[in-house]
């Protein structure tokens, strides 16, 4: 707990985030020139697995062919930092409290809890798009894949039975095909082949989702990339193997410091992630080439993102799910030449979320869709200066890892977390970007803490299952505070929903 006094003094100068319109005024804002009578655009959505937001520098093809002619959102986030719920949110535009996929195990998790009868695929398919998925769908899909099940809305279906870079099985339009670990078997290359064939074989508008297993562990690189990044320096931010975790919640305090061998494993995995992204980078280029050769590229909206980030040892953690920056932040790049966006635009300070992707794509395609929790990004991309969110909810349900159920609210300046244990975290991201100082227990921070608690009460409704079971009072880790946050909604009063399929 270092520099708390300085953080507290600066924090009292600003209790709420700045007007987002002010952020936009300082951004490099793209302007759209798309005609309402233009042909519907093709849509390409590329979703990687466990890719951090700060890795795009290692993807030169993407930088040259997506970021340079397109728009980058440096402040893009997911609203539940875990593969299964995040992918459900990408396909529906909804929070976990709406689609009810909170984690990767049932109940409230896995494929059988996902209602796939209304998704981005069905919206576009019903509007005349030819749709295809290539890669990872929803965790737990393997139980349905072996029966030949193909979700509604997909015309071409080349999906992992279980996601892996080698030694995997794909279900191709309901038929199973196994792959080994030979030079032509790497999943990134196989999926790119299938995606390119889909572009070549399509007439009319298309929707293509390419969902790679990379750079998820085991991040096995494509053939020829095994020796790349040999000189990659270890990442050692101040939060790496955090020395003083006395102000962190119990789940962090119980994590032991890393051994030398663990640090070496973290560094090796990080290098493998970068190596595996080289194959993804080439896949991006191949899909763009196919679109260009087919005369489609100019009127194609290309979206590149990841399902969540991952921590490389920050706060002694090496996975995702945590409400910390490395876990919740993701890359987000878009290109649509026909829209006339200013090439190389960046929109810093615009809090773009994974729940915004489905309504953005539907808006671009001009197709009707049900109401969503997310909002279309197109008005921002077209230069409008209307109101935009100043903060957003993050929600997560305890699963296979020791992180308790939590709700959090993240703004441009603050991250506030409240766990089902009653523990709280509050970070001033301006003064403390590495989230080293939990100031929830600092008396001078009480006005900020109370304001953030009130905001969380507004956003975290309904609460995640089990959130209200363990504690009905808020107890900051460093200081007991009276009048803490109390969420009064009961499990019985929340909206209930049965899984679409029997588990297993």
Protein language model regions, located:
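Juxtamembrane/start-of-transmembrane alpha-helix segments at the extracytoplasmic/lumenal side
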Residues: 466-480
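Short amphipathic alpha-helical coiled-coil/interface segments
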Residues: 449-456, 460
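Formylglycine-dependent sulfatase
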Residues: 25, 29-419, 424, 433-451, ...
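Functionally engaged cysteine thiol sites
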Residues: 83-84, 459-464
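Alpha-helical transmembrane segments
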Residues: 482-496
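Bacterial N-terminal signal peptides
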Residues: 7-19
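Bacterial N-terminal signal peptides that target proteins for export
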Residues: 1-7
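Cytoplasmic C-terminal tails of single-pass
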Residues: 497-504
């Amino acid at each position: 707990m270092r520099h708390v006094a300085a953080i507290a003094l600066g924090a009292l100068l600003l209790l709420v985030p700045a007007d987002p319109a002010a952020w936009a005024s300082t951004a490099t804002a793209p302007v759209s020139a798309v005609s309402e009578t233009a042909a519907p655009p093709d849509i390409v959505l590329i979703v990687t697995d466990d890719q951090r937001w700060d890795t795009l520098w290692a993807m030169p093809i993407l930088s040259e062919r997506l970021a340079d002619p397109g728009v980058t959102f440096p402040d893009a986030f997911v609203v539940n930092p875990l593969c299964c719920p995040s992918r459900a949110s990408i396909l529906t535009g909804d929070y976990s409290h709406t689609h009810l996929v909170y984690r990767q195990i049932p109940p409230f998790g896995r494929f059988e809890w996902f209602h796939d009868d209304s998704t981005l695929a069905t919206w576009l398919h019903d509007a005349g798009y030819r749709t295809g998925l290539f890669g990872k769908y929803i965790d737990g899909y393997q139980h349905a894949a072996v029966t030949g099940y193909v979700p509604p809305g997909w015309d071409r279906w080349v999906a992992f039975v279980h996601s892996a870079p080698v030694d995997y099985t794909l279900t191709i339009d309901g038929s199973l095909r196994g792959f080994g670990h030979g030079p032509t078997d790497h999943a990134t290359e196989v999926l790119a082949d299938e995606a390119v064939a889909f572009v070549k074989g399509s007439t009319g508008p298309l929707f293509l989702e390419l969902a790679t297993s990379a750079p998820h562990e085991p991040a096995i690189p494509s053939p020829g990339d095994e020796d790349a990044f040999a000189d990659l320096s270890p990442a050692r931010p101040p939060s790496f193997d955090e020395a003083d975790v006395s102000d962190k919640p119990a789940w962090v305090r119980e994590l032991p410091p890393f051994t030398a061998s663990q640090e070496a494993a973290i560094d090796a995995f990080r290098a493998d992630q970068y190596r595996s992204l080289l194959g993804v980078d080439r896949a991006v280029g191949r899909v763009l080439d196919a679109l260009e050769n087919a005369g489609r590229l100019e009127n194609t909206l290309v979206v590149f993102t990841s399902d969540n980030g991952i921590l490389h040892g920050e706060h002694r953690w090496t996975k995702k799910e945590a409400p910390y920056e490395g876990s919740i932040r993701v890359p987000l790049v878009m290109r649509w030449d026909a829209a006339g966006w200013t090439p190389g635009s960046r929109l810093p300070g615009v809090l773009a979320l994974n729940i915004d992707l489905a309504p953005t794509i539907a808006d671009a395609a001009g197709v009707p869709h049900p109401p969503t929790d997310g909002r279309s990004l197109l008005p921002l991309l077209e230069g409008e200066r209307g109101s935009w969110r100043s903060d957003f909810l993050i929600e997560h349900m305890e699963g296979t890892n020791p992180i308790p159920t939590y709700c959090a609210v993240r703004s441009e300046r603050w991250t506030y977390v409240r766990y089902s244990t009653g523990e709280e975290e509050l970070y001033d991201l301006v003064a403390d970007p590495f989230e080293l100082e939990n100031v929830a227990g600092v008396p001078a921070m009480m006005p900020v803490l109370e304001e953030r608690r009130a905001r969380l009460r507004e956003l975290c409704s309904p609460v995640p299952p089990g959130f209200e079971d363990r504690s009905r009072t808020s107890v900051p880790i460093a200081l007991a505070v009276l009048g803490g946050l109390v969420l009064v909604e009961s499990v019985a009063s929340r909206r209930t929903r049965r899984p679409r399929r029997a588990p297993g």
